[in-house]
A protein has these predicted regions:
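Basic phosphate/pyrophosphate-binding loop/patch that engages nucleotide-derived ligands
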Residues: 117
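Mixed-charge, low-complexity segments
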Residues: 1-67, 82-106, 127-133, 139, ...
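Active-site acidic/histidine clusters and adjacent loop/turn architecture
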Residues: 74-77
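Catalytic Cys-His active-site segments of thiol-dependent hydrolases/isopeptidases
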Residues: 120-127
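Short beta-strand scaffold segments in enzyme catalytic cores
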Residues: 110-113
């Protein structure tokens, strides 16, 4: 990633250019990213192809001010961290459903490993998740504004991530390339069984909570208080995307047939 792109990316998330790669810088970038670059599946509902290249993701997230899902968000964030001097690896993960009784296929999720004096799990692409990177080699609970997290060993040398006692996903501790995720990314876009095709969704952290648009509903959470507003017209939906995410969409996202 060229330095002009790095500066534009940092401007996108409201971050200064760091002098060196430190854990404090990593935590700050992680929090800012979650507050400014939303987790969203709108490309699927706007008939926009998702292309997993650094150039395409930079155009979408930095140039056009959009968001994306895990492959896009964590894939590009990893490139930013590399350009800033961090030692980074991409990791494939399975999502743990129904308390861990269901384990989805590997490559269902992309996470990032950063090596500093210790290892950190970085994830800006799992929706409502940890605000800050998680310490990989820390056996005790980790308190975070989003909840209590545990990173524990799993069978076969893998690693499980739990949030408030609920299993979230299982990470395979083997370095991957972004191109390794192209086929699962295609599946998430086109397969009838992909849950990303069900409903348009866009969500990001705020300083004191979270804001989400799901279909024709606007959900706003501040602390423990949540409000839900029905967006009754197409204009209401488009206005919500612009007000809360800065998106000027030409049409309302609609589930694919």
């Amino acid at each position: 990633m060229e330095m002009d792109t790095v500066r534009s990316y940092l401007s996108r998330i409201g971050a200064p250019t760091p002098a060196e790669p430190t854990v404090e810088v990593l935590r700050d970038l992680h929090r800012r990213h979650l507050e400014t670059v939303p987790f969203e599946n709108l490309s699927i509902h706007l008939d926009e192809p998702i292309v997993l290249t650094t150039e395409a993701l930079t155009d979408k997230i930095v140039g056009r001010g959009r968001g994306g899902f895990c492959y896009e968000l964590n894939g590009l964030f990893a490139e930013l961290l590399r350009a800033l001097g961090f030692e980074v690896e991409l990791l494939a993960a399975s999502v743990l459903v129904d308390g861990g009784r269901i384990v989805t296929p590997i490559f269902d999720h992309l996470a990032v490993l950063v090596r500093l004096e210790e290892r950190y799990l970085v994830d800006v692409g799992f929706g409502a998740h940890a605000t800050y990177p998680l310490r990989v080699d820390w056996p005790e609970a980790q308190e975070d504004p989003a909840g209590e997290f545990l990173v524990v060993d799993a069978p076969g040398g893998d690693m499980d991530v739990l949030m408030d006692g609920v299993p979230q996903y299982r990470v395979e501790m083997r370095p991957r390339r972004l191109s390794d995720f192209e086929r699962p990314c295609w599946w998430q876009q086109h397969a009838p069984d992909s849950h990303f095709r069900d409903t348009p969704r866009c969500s990001r952290n705020t300083e004191d909570g979270r804001v989400t648009v799901v279909g024709d509903r606007l959900l706003e959470t501040v602390g423990d208080h949540r409000t839900e507003t029905t967006l009754t017209t197409d204009e209401d939906v488009l206005s919500a995307y612009e007000k809360h995410f800065g998106f000027r969409l030409a049409k309302v996202p609609t589930p694919p047939v």
